[in-house]
Swiss-Prot record:
GO terms for molecular function: nuclease activity; rRNA primary transcript binding. It is found in: Nucleus. It comes from Saccharomyces cerevisiae (strain ATCC 204508 / S288c). Residues 141-198 are annotated as: Disordered. InterPro entries: Rpr2/Snm1/Rpp21 (IPR007175). Residues 188-198 have a biased composition (Low complexity). Component of RNase MRP complex which consists of an RNA moiety and at least 10 protein subunits including POP1, POP3, POP4, POP5, POP6, POP7, POP8, RMP1, RPP1 and SNM1, many of which are shared with the RNase P complex. The keyword Nucleus applies. This is Ribonuclease MRP protein subunit SNM1.
Amino acid sequence: MNKDQAEKYQERSLRQKYNLLHVLPTLNSRALSGLYYKNFHNSVKRYQIMLPEQLKSGKFCSHCGCVYVPNFNASLQLTTNTEQGDSDELGGESMEGPKKCIQVNCLNCEKSKLFEWKSEFVVPTFGQDVSPMINSTSSGKVSYAVKKPQKSKTSTGKERSKKRKLNSLTNLLSKRNQEKKMEKKKSSSLSLESFMKS
């Protein structure tokens, strides 16, 4: 297998595992979702891929591995960290007063997790084509597609062929002849003007 084929295989297998993780909640199989979750993360480690923070922290249950789907296999509840007494789960920071949190209860394994409430809406910046799984670049890293700064324009094959045609001998001769004709026209008009002035 050459490098391109290996990258395509890697991308295909990771995409399949990722997609299966999203299909498995419909089967209601805790063991199977945990197995695929572990398999997906082992593959990510093997290929040394950096996952976005959205995939690492709050999308999957850390106990059973299923994808959180509200009102299907997870229940959401708005609470404060003082009600729960779980400030350690939010980072162990000493907080001034009660802070809003979202408590996600996994209905498969009955475990709960707290997430910090973010009141501002964060708009992700994506490139033209949103591909949240795998970039097909040579590095094969998993990340969200982001607009890259435009590089200086490089000449394409079409532009190079046009330049070759313009620089051919016949074209150069025809340009030279046209320039001579233009000079004659200008010189004749100049002589007429000079004649009129005198």
